[in-house]
Design a protein with these regions (language model features):
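Short, solvent-exposed recognition segments
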Residues: 2-16, 142-215
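Juxtadomain coupling helices with adjacent low-complexity linkers
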Residues: 217, 235-278
């Protein structure tokens, strides 16, 4: 099953805050508004005023002002007790996708890959300690899933995350390693620093990552990088399946070659577009 657990063990308001310190150009009220939006999630789709204030660290009065502003703008609704995001919030996320024309080119390649391998395919980028899904093509098999565009998962324990982490400069990787969550998601989870460094080094050398039930029992996936014209890794693509019908050997022998062909094709499209980033 592909059930999202947590992102990085933090509340949405805490997750992967920018290490940059606010300066004169920092608009605190705007930042607080974003924190309020991020406090809503699959685990907290509806919240009271007190819950929003607790999740964001704001006072009740401050949280109320922001919620009422968002409600006036149409991004939040309320029944008088509970607040929830409205579909209009999708405009903010789709602005990113619509401003990134590569995904209009990548999606057909991903759909073709799904047709070939009969497994789901996703693309993600790295944001702090998380991978953020920016495109997902589902297989037609009947299965439970709540992963979609905008979903976040802990980078150290996803195949796409390890591909993206493997491309980081050593100092950035060390900084993220020091901040990562210290727990095992399953009995298969790699938790030690030495284990994770060794695995990420192996991913860097071989150019792809395979994870077998480290984040969730029953979930197996393989991922490879999408690179720009300079050879820089800017995103990752994966194929995910269920371990009870997809073995590591099948992933390596049958699915990996097709995944690598797809990432090469998408990388070529990115290079041809002249864009350096997604």
């Amino acid at each position: 099953m592909e059930t999202v657990k947590t992102t990085s063990g933090k509340t949405p308001g805490e997750a992967d805050a920018s290490p940059l310190k606010p300066g004169d150009s920092y608009v605190q009220s705007f930042a607080r508004g974003l924190e309020v939006i991020r406090s809503f999630s699959a685990r907290a789709p509806e919240q009271t005023l007190s819950e929003v204030a607790a999740a964001t660290g704001l006072t009740r009065a401050g949280a109320r002002r922001i919620l009422l502003t968002l409600q006036t703008l149409g991004y939040v609704r309320s029944d008088g007790k509970y607040y929830a995001l409205t579909p209009r919030i999708l405009d903010l996320g789709f602005a990113y996708l619509s401003s990134t024309p590569l995904w209009n080119l990548a999606e057909p390649a991903m759909e073709a890959l799904v047709d070939e391998v009969k497994e789901s395919c996703s693309a993600a980028v790295l944001e702090g300690l998380d991978v953020v899904y920016v495109l997902r093509v589902h297989t037609h098999k009947i299965m439970s899933t709540n992963l979609g565009v905008g979903s976040r998962l802990p980078a150290f324990w996803t195949s796409m995350g390890r591909v993206l982490l493997a491309a980081l400069p050593p100092e950035e990787l060390r900084a993220l390693m020091a901040r990562r969550e210290q727990r095992a998601f399953t009995r298969h989870t790699l938790t030690g620093d030495d284990e994770l460094y060794a695995e990420i080094a192996r991913v860097r050398e071989q150019g792809w990552a395979l994870l077998n039930q480290e984040l969730e029992e029953g979930l197996i996936s393989v991922a490879a990088p999408i690179r720009n014209a300079r050879g820089q890794t800017v995103a990752a693509l994966n194929i995910s399946g269920q371990a009870n019908r997809t073995s590591e050997q099948m992933m390596r022998e049958r699915l990996l070659p097709q995944l690598l062909a797809a990432t090469r094709h998408i990388s070529q499209l990115l290079s041809a577009s002249g864009r350096m980033h997604l």
